[in-house]
């Protein structure tokens, strides 16, 4: 089986209206057409993912809130056999994170997030919350809900320091 992973990219697969705002309907229709084309070709529509936060990320991305609106419209418009996997994903230093959607807790709108892949396998499938932000375009930069930092941040810092030390040690041995 052939499967497709497709990046959600501004200026390529997302369209803006005359005011520069994301055109949710037109952008979603672009993805719906792609999903139907994949089905006709026998290609599985595996996933839609956000551009990695590297290089020209600011040019190719849109706010996560907008991307979530497009994804939800695509997901609800395609036949089940033509749909992408259930969630939008984005890679971060901590791992591959899915945006499950939004929830409201005590009157506050939040993003629900989950690790699909992680630097520490104990983080896998763990759901956590971050404050809803209409402008943020990177999952790793979302503000944690109910805490000063995300549950994984201290351990991630330790992992990254160990990796750095290991690389430096290897360099000095050569």
Task: Name what the model sees in each region.
Residues 1-30, 44-60, 90-91:
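Conserved strand-turn element in the central/C-terminal portion of the radical SAM core barrel
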Residues 36-174:
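Auxiliary Fe-S-binding modules of radical SAM enzymes
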